[in-house]
Amino acid sequence: MTADTPSWPEVLSALLARRDLTEAEAAWAMHQIMSGEATDAQIAAFAVALRAKGESAEEVSGLSSVMLALAAPVPPIGEALDIVGSGGDRAHTVNISTMAAIVAAATGVVVAKHGNRAASSACGSADLLEALGVAIDLDGAGVARCIERAGIGFCFAPVFHPSLRYAAVARREIGIPTVFNFLGPLTNPARPTASAVGVADPRMAPVVAGVLARRGMRALVFRGDDGLDELTVTTTSTVWVVRDGSVQEVAFDPRAVGIEPADTAALRGADARHNAAVARAVLSGERGPIRDAVLLNAAAGLTAFDTPRPDQLVDQISAAMTRCAAAIDTGKAAQLLDAWVEASQAARGVDADRS
């Protein structure tokens, strides 16, 4: 394959031969897709062949770099954190990462969350935030205003990645998870400097960690050993600690930070209205397994932001959980949500005036 001018037959032949693409080759394919040059057949063949071979960190880096380059911009926001899950665990839990993001922001860390509506559950992060009263359809300037006024903002994926529409038909018609399902956590247009990322697919979790390491980010990538795309409270989790361009895999047991195991059923959610009521209850201090899960994942975010250390992970998460619990119990988390709702609605009004 010629590095300067790859072609679809060359790219697809390489994947069928189970050869990893270079970052540049993967980037070429993604640019073809997101510019509308690729046909539905080419997109479907690429996604399926890549999935069958197994995605590499270099390939996913190429794909995600093109998405970020073509994304609608967000004004620079400095050091920031994202807490996000890949979805796809089919467990239909409440929106743990979204609640965790609010709690983390209430401790004083700037949070820039990136998300979408539900794909495989009844309620995605965008659905929950909308039910809570947050204006989700803001442009980059609106997101930045929310961060300035409330310390947290939300980038709604369809607003910032409109070129993904070119892959929509192929993704829908092949009907199986592909690399596109894992690009969301890697393509936050606000470009946070730290991430806590839950990945349900055991094959993709270390790949996601590898992509973040290649970017020089600080991150915790994790998968519950029960299959959840969260740091789970039902059993142990596997964690990939990302710092200084490297990845180290460690095991994490929630009992080490004082959490007694719960059943997955205790975390189950429903539609956006139900999950919004749960979120307000947790942010107002309600105790139980959902609070434990929210504290644990918010603490993972703070640990990633503060630079994670594999040999001190339990101590770091334990200390961060104390900060997160205080943010809830002092009322700061509930107050932050109210401030975010107000800031987002005001920003929506500014957007409307500009248009």
Swiss-Prot record:
The record's catalysed reaction(s) read: N-(5-phospho-beta-D-ribosyl)anthranilate + diphosphate = 5-phospho-alpha-D-ribose 1-diphosphate + anthranilate
User: Which pathway features in its UniProt record?
Assistant: Amino-acid biosynthesis; L-tryptophan biosynthesis; L-tryptophan from chorismate: step 2/5
One GO CC annotation, please? Answer: cytosol
Which GO biological process categories is it annotated with?
L-tryptophan biosynthetic process
The residues listed in the UniProt record as binding anthranilate 1, with positions renumbered to this chain, are 85, 116
Tell me the cofactor note.
Binds 2 magnesium ions per monomer.
In this chain, Mg(2+) 1 is annotated as bound at 97, 230
Known EC number(s)?
2.4.2.18
Q: Where does Mg(2+) 2 bind?
A: 229-230
Q: Does the keyword Metal-binding apply?
A: yes
Keywords of this protein's UniProt record, alphabetized? Amino-acid biosynthesis, Aromatic amino acid biosynthesis, Glycosyltransferase, Magnesium, Metal-binding, Transferase, Tryptophan biosynthesis
Subunit structure as annotated in this protein's UniProt entry? Homodimer.
**Cross-referenced NCBIfam families:** trpD (TIGR01245)
Give the protein's recorded name: Anthranilate phosphoribosyltransferase
